[in-house]
Amino acid sequence: MEKFFKLNEKGSNVKTELIAGLTTFLAMAYILGVNPAVLADAGMDKASVFLATAISAGVASIFQGLVANYPVALASGMGVNALFAYTICGQMGFSWAAALSAVFISGIIFILISVTGVRKAIINAIPVQLKLAIGAGIGFFIAFVGLKNAGIIVASPSTFVTIGNLTDPTVLLAIVGLLITIALVIKNVPAAVFVGMVITAVIGIILGFMGMAGMPTLPEHFISFDFELQAAGSCFSGISELFANPFQAFVVIFSFLFVDFFDTAGTLVAIGNRIGLINDKGELENAEQALLADAVGTVFGAVLGTSTVTSFVESSSGVGVGGRTGLTACTSGVCFLLAVFLSPLILSTVTNAVTAPALIVVGIMMAQQLKGIDWDDMIFAAAGFVTVIMMILMYSISNGIACGFIVYTIAMIAAGKAKEVHPTVWALMIIFVLYFATPYIM
């Protein structure tokens, strides 16, 4: 095992990788509850989506670990599932079967451009300082997600965002968990993020026994054997509906391609920066294999009946406790497969109050990449700042990346350095502009 995953070379060991994999899984476990709820709004069966989500995440994560040796787990992505349910099925009126067809086709296209090296070429064309901004931006983004999920911040019609209800016991639990986790990190406690999550969950369960509502609880039955994949294979039956209007079909498939491509790119770049997978030329090690795992996961997930499977930025939680190899991803994958049986226990104990502190602390760690940006150079300062701020304000990793690329290209033109812009970056800038112009085109 040590030779296969190169544990010694990566400065890790089996125990650390197992803990990291479990930590990543716990940080991602919310998707097992959220994804079925979101896709149910498109008319899909919750139980079926839960099963498809768990199995596809397990298989894709294990594939990632074995083929790419990356500590990055995969599952049905947030954001892209909302695109599936509320835009493709809601606003555009497609059935969920047709939407699954679009996911399946986008996955096939991903496999082709991953095998041919096109995806790697695009990622490697991103300027190094933009990669740092993307990594830091994702850190701010997941910290924002953690704060929102915990209820520490809430939406406000007057100020957009405001402080949450600090008298809510679940909000207080998340705050206590955050402070505990920060203290553990400062004290250099091994697996501090994971330990913080466990302590938070235990405190919540105890408070639940004392009668406080909304706390993590222990279920009556820890194991379930109620399985049914109602949507399996539906991606094939929806193809004719999808292509009834070829232009709309193109828009739908392109939307899935765009969101998954750059969410994945951002995640891999961010984690690659953290663990030294990016060389002096700014190239990502084993990029083809990691991107192929993402593409295969999407195809497999579509066949089972779930939205696009993508690399999860929450994998940085596992990296934060020492995960450095594919054994971390394999461990997370096994946990997802076991989750098929342990759904009652997982959904009742791993609440937002438990995962939020981990997301916030890891966000703090990832934000440190900002120090690598040359803030005296207005080109990178502007592009980096816009990348970070737009990820948060638009609540979208891919939109933040798109804005950063556009600003970077325009800034290079203004500085008289247009010839230094990589051809791939020019092409991406044009695609990003067209992406934002899609509502006007439609």
Task: Please name every model-derived segment.
Residues 60-72, 182-188, 255-263, 294-304, ...:
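Transmembrane alpha-helix interface/packing and boundary motifs in multi-pass membrane proteins
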Residues 18, 38, 122, 191, ...:
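Residue-level signature of catalytic and energy-coupling elements of molecular machines
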Residues 51, 101-104, 254, 292, ...:
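Internal alpha-helical transmembrane segments of multi-pass membrane proteins, especially GPCRs
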Residues 1-35, 56, 76-86, 90-138, ...:
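Helix-loop-helix junctions within the multi-pass membrane cores of secondary transporters/permeases
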Residues 43-62:
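Loop-to-helix transition at the N-terminal end of transmembrane alpha-helices
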Residues 92-206, 210, 330-442:
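Membrane-embedded alpha-helical modules
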Residues 1-48, 162-163, 197-288, 433-434:
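Helix-loop-helix hairpins and the membrane-proximal interhelical loops
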